């Protein structure tokens, strides 16, 4: 979450007049994440999140995201729900941006990821994949393999200003992934951005999954690979095989990975690392002036990608091939 668009108090008051949320007591911008402008609202009826949808979120996609949250919640996935205004609409316009109010979930995201956190995320991700199986709406993943070359082209001219040799490193890896990306694996609804700051915990207990604005239809095992990158590395960028094996085993107890999915996981993890490397690189090079935002280091994902390049089988992630297989 972040703030790219400021909201004046009178604009916000006018917007909120269409909702039954009580009186506004306070609001503040939230300087985390990189995609939308987010505010925490405190009203006489409680706390809510206000989101203004920015650059990468198309207005046409918003019904998919909001309906998906309702679908998942109806199937036992704890996630935030959009709040309808008095006209029954969950989308409005504020400060020239599409805007929605989302209900508030208790909990905080884990600043220091533990093994129990990884177990909870593995189980929750598998349940999400199963719960999304009968969701009728579809959305292509614009940030899967077909979307990486445009990102590369947007950053390539200045890539070496971030790290010497980065341009050639990216070009070689992108070509390899484009030539070898798997297609015949199970597909369905994926979260596509399930990082620690998109999962809320009370202690070691998961209290909710948030930020579904990258959710889409893609390879289910690709979502697993994203979580390996997001949850299983330490602050010094070393890979924690205990966290990885815990995460994978917890996932597999709910939705076992097939043999082809297991075989593809190292390549999928490379792709996931490249995807976040490229989007971080583009953001690093193009932060809007004056934005209340903390750009994330793209070089973190260079190191992760190099690790995955050295993994040949799922055993490199701490899971024997006999485990969690259908």
Curated annotation (Swiss-Prot):
EC number: 2.7.1.39
Catalytic reactions of this protein: L-homoserine + ATP = O-phospho-L-homoserine + ADP + H(+)
Keyword Kinase part of the UniProt annotation: yes
Single annotated GO MF: ATP binding
Enzyme class: transferase
Organism: Afipia carboxidovorans (strain ATCC 49405 / DSM 1227 / KCTC 32145 / OM5)
Pfam families cross-referenced by the UniProt entry: APH
Protein name: Homoserine kinase
PANTHER family: AMINOGLYCOSIDE PHOSPHOTRANSFERASE DOMAIN-CONTAINING PROTEIN, AMINOGLYCOSIDE PHOSPHOTRANSFERASE DOMAIN-CONTAINING PROTEIN-RELATED
Pathway(s) where this gene product acts: Amino-acid biosynthesis; L-threonine biosynthesis; L-threonine from L-aspartate: step 4/5
InterPro entries membership: Aminoglycoside_PTrfase, Homoserine_kinase_II, Kinase-like_dom_sf, Pseudomonas-type_ThrB
Keyword check for RNA-binding: no
Family to which the UniProt record says this protein belongs: Belongs to the pseudomonas-type ThrB family.
Keyword field: Amino-acid biosynthesis, ATP-binding, Kinase, Nucleotide-binding, Threonine biosynthesis, Transferase
One GO biological process term: threonine biosynthetic process
């Amino acid at each position: 979450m972040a703030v790219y668009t400021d909201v004046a108090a009178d604009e916000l008051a006018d917007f909120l007049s269409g909702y039954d949320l009580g009186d506004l007591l306070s609001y503040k911008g939230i300087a985390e994440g990189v995609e939308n402008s987010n505010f925490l609202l405190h009203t006489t009826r409680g706390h809510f999140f206000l989101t203004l949808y920015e650059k990468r979120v198309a207005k046409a996609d918003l019904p998919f995201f909001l309906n998906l949250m309702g679908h998942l919640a109806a199937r036992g996935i704890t996630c935030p729900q959009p709040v309808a205004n008095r006209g029954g609409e969950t989308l409005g316009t504020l400060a020239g941006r599409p805007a929605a109010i989302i209900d508030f979930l208790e909990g905080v995201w884990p600043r220091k990821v533990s093994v129990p956190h990884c177990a909870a995320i593995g189980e929750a991700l598998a349940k999400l994949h199963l719960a999304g199986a009968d969701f009728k709406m579809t959305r292509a993943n614009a940030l899967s393999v077909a979307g990486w070359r445009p990102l590369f082209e947007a950053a390539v001219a200045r890539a070496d200003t971030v790290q010497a040799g980065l341009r050639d490193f990216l070009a070689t890896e992108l070509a390899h992934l484009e030539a070898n990306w798997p297609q015949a694996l199970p597909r369905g609804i994926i979260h596509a951005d399930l990082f620690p700051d998109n999962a809320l915990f009370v202690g070691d207990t998961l209290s909710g999954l948030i930020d579904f604005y990258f959710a889409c239809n893609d390879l289910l095992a690709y979502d697993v690979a994203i979580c390996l990158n997001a949850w299983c590395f330490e602050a010094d960028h070393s890979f924690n095989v205990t966290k990885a094996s815990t995460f994978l085993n917890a996932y597999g107890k709910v939705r076992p990975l097939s043999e082809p999915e297991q075989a593809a996981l190292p390549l999928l993890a490379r792709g996931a690392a490249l995807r976040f490397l490229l989007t971080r690189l583009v953001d690093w090079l193009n932060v809007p002036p004056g934005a209340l935002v903390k750009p994330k280091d793209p070089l973190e994902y260079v190191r992760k990608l190099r690790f995955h390049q050295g993994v040949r089988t799922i055993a490199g992630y701490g899971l024997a091939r006999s485990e969690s297989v259908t």
